[in-house]
């Protein structure tokens, strides 16, 4: 078992190469597990915000803690809401973001 304490930080606007907008990012942790780097962050997408199509070297796990959103690949688009867990495979081109209703 490995436990990592996540520091409490204030969210800050992020503006990276995969962003269509400036979502709010609360940095989480980056740790090593079985020779792999595992990262976590809390991201809040304001109404209408989303990422551009992008990929990751490893699996990306999204967990919707509140609100509604949209996740998409080149082949499909799905609505998601509080309690949904989404997995993207390594190299799978995708985007994710919010609907136009409220923060998510």
Feature roles, as predicted:
Residues 26-27, 39-56, 90:
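Conserved short histidine dyad/triad with adjacent acidic residue
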Residues 74-91:
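Short acidic-glycine-tyrosine-enriched beta hairpin
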Residues 42-46, 55-73:
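Short, conserved beta-strand element in jelly-roll/cupin
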